[in-house]
Each structure stands twice: as C-alpha cells, then as structure tokens.
C-alpha cells in the first residue's frame, strides 16, 4: 500500500529533508513525498536530484493556490509564516490529488528507522492522528505553546479528517505567532 507524506523545508533544512526522504526509501516499501520548497535554492537542488517518489511544490505555487495563506505572509515573521504553511500543505495535496486517501504531514527533521506500517495499522480506522507532547513535569510550562506535537499529523480524506484539517488551517491563518 502506498503511503502519502508531505513536508517542507528551505536550504537550511535541505540535508535534514534529504535524510527524511532516504529514511523513507529504506523503511517504507511504497510512498510519495510532496515537498514544499520554501526557497529557490532548495527547489533547484531537489529538481536536479530527480528523486523517485518526491514531488516538488515551489512556495509560489502554494501561495497562488491559497490566497489566505499569501495574505498572512504580511503579518508574521518568516518562521511564523513557515509554521502557518503546516496545515496548508496537506490541504493543497488533498485538493490536487484525489487518489490520496490519507495525507501525513512530517517535520523535515524526522527519520524513520523501520517501516511505519505498525503506526498506520494502529490508526487505520481513524480520521485524524496527532501526537501529544507528553511533557515531563519539569517542562509543563511549555504547554503554553500547545499540547500537541505537529511533527507527525495524519488526516484521512473523510468528513472528520477534512473538517479537522480545515479548522487547523483556519486557526493557523488567524494566529500562528
């Protein structure tokens, strides 16, 4: 079964993004990875590499397809803007690729040491998969930044999954700084 992932990075995270890709190549039998290239250097390097299963999305393409995202660019820092892209990217993939039944957003600095099939088996009937931070009591003050880690977030193309993704996108567009 083909797994569908998306991530984003710029030239500063290019090596991490490539490590994520290579770990997927070794651990996941069949996958597609959409990469939102946050700068032209990243896009050009990945375009030259022509990696199988990797699909490139220049930032400009996402912005042209999401006017609300583009409008948000003017009221936040570059890093905050990148974070705002987190729900917009899986939305874009689902809107443009109707065969994708579940999209999983991954932070670019993740690395797979084994096949993620067990994880997908566990969430097989779930519309949404999200991981709580599970802060150690010493770090509970960090809950002010959120109780969930968005490093791995998965959405099924069904009513609940799409509604949750849409709500997350709206909330990030309203406030992500």
Range-by-range predicted roles:
Residues 1-177:
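Glycosyltransferase catalytic domains, chiefly GT-A lineage
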